[in-house]
């Protein structure tokens, strides 16, 4: 019997790098098994290369990101790496890194395995970068796209550099996200390739025509030669130009994917699944019906955004800034109050006790709007507590109301009725805050009364590997 194919998935995240090996598993409901995975902290934060960017600048050192990637791969089992038939790569969207074509990296043969080290490469300016003020953004041309442009988006950053550091841009002739860079270096691509998932995250990209707003950009003096060529997500960018951690030279490498899309792909078994992730923040994503096209003008006040997915479809995504971080704020407040009263209690003890109390308290009239951080579409909204009565003041009541408020806030952004109109039949629940909180699970089931599945955590590295695994299996069948 032929060995089942193995694919490698890599995710280059903001704080960590992850790699996962997947094998086809026809007997498993998911169709795949994770053979091994490894994560390493990137620790890549770097001093900003331009003083003009000020304290809002956020940059990362590419060599540290690659070091974390190499550490991940070195920890994976070598015999399985030798059997890899495809590599999928995803990563943090919106950011931009610049390099010189043909000089972006150098392959070194000295160690146990050939590795590539960055050469004529800038820092990565990340999605968290805040150098583009609202005044600066208002001065930019209006994009011909359904997505608006924000600080930290690749095209906005390039506009900023054009204005404040034009000499910097003259040093480079290629640009992409960090994961586009890795794919280009692995394959020795003469020009970077970019999926529409990452292009849309840069701004000034029209997903309907699958093209950059070249005329709009050119008329504003934008260096359009830096814009990567566009390729379909799920397609092959090229083949590895060297053996790499036992992975054979000539192995297929997929076009880099957005981490949001790869994460959702890892969990969404059917097109009729919605994926709910409650970690620090909250995301609820569903695949839009085929043929759906978003309105062609940006609406920053809309609570749902539409992002390119696969096969020219879109994901509808409600992303709330208020999730597990709100519970953490509440726990911290209680611990602080007790410290003020002369009592010392561990945060972990408070968390487990308050969840226990809320499990016992099945209902409450207390209403908490938990938006302590506002929302992207309502930045000025703060949190509030209403319908307070003397009978609803126990820890159980307050914790139940807080968990309900987190879920109800999400439901107000993307209601169950909307999901059902899109054809959603099941919700896949994931994320650290949801997995360890039975009260949140109960409230999710109350607000979204659909079949629920908990436990399969979203994982962008697994999603990237899965895209390449399914591609390989489809190629074999055809």
Curated annotation (Swiss-Prot):
Gene Ontology biological process: carbohydrate metabolic process; cellular response to interleukin-13; cellular response to interleukin-4; cellular response to lipopolysaccharide; pentose-phosphate shunt; pentose-phosphate shunt, non-oxidative branch; phosphorylation; regulation of inflammatory response
Top-level EC class: transferase
Statement: the UniProt record of this protein carries the keyword Coiled coil: no
Tissue localization of expression: Strongly expressed in liver, kidney and pancreas. Expressed at lower levels in placenta and heart. Very weakly expressed in lung and brain.
pH and activity: Optimum pH is 8.5.
Catalytic activity: sedoheptulose + ATP = D-sedoheptulose 7-phosphate + ADP + H(+)
An example Gene Ontology CC term for this record: cytoplasm
CDD domains: ASKHA_NBD_FGGY_SHK
A GO MF term: ATP binding
Upregulation: Down-regulated by LPS.
Job of this protein: Acts as a modulator of macrophage activation through control of glucose metabolism.
Family assignment from sequence similarity: Belongs to the FGGY kinase family.
Protein name (database record): Sedoheptulokinase
């Amino acid at each position: 019997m032929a060995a089942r194919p193995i694919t490698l998935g890599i995710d280059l995240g903001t704080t960590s790098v992850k790699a996962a090996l997947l094998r086809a598993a026809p007997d498993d409901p998911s169709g795949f098994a994770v053979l091994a995975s490894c994560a390493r902290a990137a620790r890549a934060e770097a001093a900003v290369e331009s003083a003009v960017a000020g304290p809002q600048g956020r940059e990362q050192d590419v060599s540290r990101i690659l070091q974390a990637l190499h550490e991940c791969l070195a920890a994976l089992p070598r015999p399985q790496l030798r059997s890899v038939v495809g590599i999928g790569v995803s990563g943090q969207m919106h950011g931009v890194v610049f390099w010189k074509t043909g000089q972006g990296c150098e392959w070194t043969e000295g160690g146990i395995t050939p590795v590539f080290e960055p050469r004529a490469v800038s820092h990565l300016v990340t999605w968290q970068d805040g150098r583009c003020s609202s005044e600066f953004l208002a001065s930019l041309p209006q994009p011909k796209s359904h997505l608006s442009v924000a600080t930290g988006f690749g095209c906005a950053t390039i506009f900023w550099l054009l204005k404040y550091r034009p000499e910097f841009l003259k040093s480079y002739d290629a640009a992409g996200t960090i994961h586009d860079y890795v794919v280009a270096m692995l394959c020795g691509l003469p020009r970077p390739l970019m999926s529409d998932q990452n292009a849309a995250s840069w701004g000034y990209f029209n997903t309907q025509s699958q093209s950059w707003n070249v005329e709009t950009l050119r008329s504003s003096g934008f260096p359009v030669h830096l814009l990567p060529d566009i390729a379909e997500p799920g397609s092959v960018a090229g083949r590895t130009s060297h053996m790499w951690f036992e992975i054979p030279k000539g192995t297929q490498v997929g076009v880099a994917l957005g981490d949001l899309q790869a994460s959702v792909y890892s969990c969404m078994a059917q097109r009729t699944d919605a994926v709910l992730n409650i970690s620090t923040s909250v995301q609820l994503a569903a695949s839009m019906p085929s043929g759906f096209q978003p309105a062609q003008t940006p609406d920053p006040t809309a609570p749902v955004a539409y992002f390119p997915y696969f096969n020219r479809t879109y994901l509808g995504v409600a992303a709330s800034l208020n999730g597990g971080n709100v519970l953490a704020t509440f726990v911290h407040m209680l611990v602080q109050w007790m410290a003020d009263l002369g009592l010392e209690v561990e945060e972990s003890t408070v968390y487990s006790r308050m969840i226990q109390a809320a499990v016992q308290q099945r209902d409450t009239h207390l209403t908490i709007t938990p938006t302590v951080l506002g929302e992207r579409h309502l930045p000025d909204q703060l949190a509030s507590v209403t319908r307070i009565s003397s009978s609803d003041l126990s820890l159980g009541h307050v914790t139940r109301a807080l968990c309900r408020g987190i879920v109800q806030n999400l439901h107000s952004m993307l209601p169950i009725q909307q999901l059902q109109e899109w054809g959603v039949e099941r919700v896949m629940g994931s994320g650290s805050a949801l997995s360890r909180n039975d009260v949140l699970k109960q409230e999710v089931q109350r607000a979204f009364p659909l079949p629920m599945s908990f436990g399969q955590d979203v994982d962008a590295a697994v999603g990237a590997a899965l895209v390449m695994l399914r591609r390989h299996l489809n190629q074999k069948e055809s």
